[in-house]
Amino acid sequence: MIATRTLDGRLVRLVPLAPAHAEVDARWNADAEVRHWLHRSEDGPELRTRAAVEKKIREVIADPYELRFVIETREGLPIGDVGLLGLHPHGRAELSIKIGEKSHWSGGYGTDAILCLLGFAFTELALRRVTLIADADNARGIRCYEKCGFRHEGVLRAHRLRYGKPLDMVAMAVLREEFAPPADDGGRR
């Protein structure tokens, strides 16, 4: 699904994903520390070149069940991406987020991006539920999701492999009626 407009948060702007973002995304994907927290941490080099990422971006844009944005600082620096996967006619989708610029980790940018996207998802897309799964050892990410209103729904035991070892994952979700956008957003969401 093509994102058609920019969404504004307190710290970030969500701009529609475009092939022009391929170079920066390939750089993030090539960083082992960034990749460690992604569900594809052991992927081969296929999404680490500009050409491969550009091809993938074109596929994402053409997919009617996926909506992706690049996270930019208010100054226009791309720092990651956020999106909704598996958009379903029953009003649900799965959240995906990556902060690729490590200098922006733990600065509130991911929280702001998620809150901005959730506001859009529940109001303009009329979703009922947004889910996610996170590595059980990703304490920073889980705290962020909790701040955004996600609740724990269960543990997926030995759900994926990371570096050849089974890893538990935490299933979380937020419902439309549970979501409360921040009061200090100045009406930007």
Task: Pin down the residues of each PLM region.
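Conserved beta-strand-loop-alpha-helix junction that forms the acyl-donor binding cleft
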Residues: I99-K102, L132-I142, H159-Y163
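Core beta-strand residues in small-molecule sensory/regulatory alpha/beta domains
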Residues: E72-T73, L156, L161
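Conserved G/P- and acidic residue-centered "switch" motifs that form tight phosphate/ATP-binding loops
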Residues: G76, G108, N138, G164
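Conserved active-site tyrosine of GNAT-family acetyltransferases
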Residues: Y145, F150, M172
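GNAT-family acyltransferases
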Residues: M1-S103, P166-L167, A171-R189
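Conserved acetyl-CoA-binding loop-helix of GNAT-fold acetyltransferases
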Residues: S106-F120, I142-K147
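Conserved GNAT acetyl-CoA-binding A-motif
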Residues: T123-I133
